[in-house]
């Protein structure tokens, strides 16, 4: 966290620890509270501008009422929002959610940070992935009748908006066996049939010949 005066000079800098940070003896003037780095699972908060008058009163920009701490000191509150990622597994033809796929989110070090089986609703991950970091969506098992999809790389939005990732599955193509006729076998069959016809015809002629002798 940093506190800057109207000239952009840093008048105080600290790392939050879960307790209120106290800044004393601030001269009258305009100030900006900035978050330089957010904790993992959170996005960097919007800057807060406030003014301190000569009496020590604090007016926060766009805030009607200023909070006070337990000891009565003016309190400027900065709230961090969580990272939000929505992952959808869909049929590429219908665009409908596809249940039964086993999916993983993997970080750049190869660690599996989230694992689940898809359902009829998109999968939502909140406050677990790090803003601005790249992850890989991997399908390890596809639903029956579908092909495993290619991996998808995505980066978590750092502005507080929902990062939407869609992975499509295609149906496994049906394999048809083409007809591969064996010409040699066909010729042999026809030759045998022809030979049988010749033998039968010869027998008939022979028998007829004997009958009239």
Each model region followed by its residue ranges:
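Solvent-exposed loop/turn and edge beta-strand elements of beta-rich ligand-binding domains
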Residues: 1-213
